[in-house]
Amino acid sequence: MKTYDRNRNAIATGSMVMIAGNGTTGVIKAIHGEGKTAEQLRRADCVEIDGCEGRFCPLDLVRLGFH
């Protein structure tokens, strides 16, 4: 599954990202977007990041590298 970060860069499973609010970096483990439109997906807490607790909204992420 693919969505877009706060700068409209494509992000998908395996992408290296930074959480804009706290500067923590990690790799996307999963994007849970079943049954959501692209717009709903971009605004929902649906991204799991390796080494971080919880799910994050794509608008709170900044892509650092694309696998």
Predicted regions, residues:
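Short hydrophobic/aromatic patches at helix-to-coil boundaries
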Residues: 63-67
